[in-house]
């Protein structure tokens, strides 16, 4: 029994680099961020789920097609996307939640903005590949 407990604890203590599923998911999110900073339809299509629901911090909600269009036609451009915190959890097989906060600089329809954003994202394993399924975010006001 003691050996089983020690084995279980050693698996739970593995860093991300030694946890293959967490490493795959981190790589998928890194690819998503890279695609948002230098967008092409192909890069975005590869990482976004067909059923994407993307709720921006201003309340606007996009589908996959709407998000890809706004990023590739220049309506929205991101120049900074820097995580302060990014945590993954696996509540069910094939589902991952990602929570945290990041600093962003963007220009949306000609209006420049710089903010700190809090978020909850959902990733789903689709045909063996992690796909970005949902995003909900809110602006975090500066400390007073």
Predicted features along the sequence, with ranges:
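Hydrophobic h-region of N-terminal signal peptides that target proteins for export
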Residues: 9-17
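A beta-strand edge to alpha-helix "cap/lid" segment located at domain peripheries
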Residues: 17-46, 51-144
């Amino acid at each position: 029994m003691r050996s089983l407990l020690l084995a279980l604890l050693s698996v739970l203590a593995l860093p991300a680099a030694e946890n293959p599923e967490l490493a795959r998911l981190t790589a998928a999110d890194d690819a998503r961020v890279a695609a948002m900073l230098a967008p092409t339809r192909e890069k975005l299509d590869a990482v976004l789920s067909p059923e994407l629901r993307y709720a921006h911090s201003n309340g606007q909600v996009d589908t996959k097609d709407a998000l890809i269009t706004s990023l590739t036609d220049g309506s929205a451009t991101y120049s900074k996307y820097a995580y302060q915190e990014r945590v993954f959890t696996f509540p069910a097989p094939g589902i991952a939640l990602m929570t945290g906060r990041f600093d962003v600089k963007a220009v949306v329809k000609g209006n420049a903005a710089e903010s700190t954003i809090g978020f909850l994202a959902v990733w789903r394993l689709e045909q063996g590949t992690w796909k970005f399924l949902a995003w909900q975010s809110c602006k975090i006001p500066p400390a007073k």
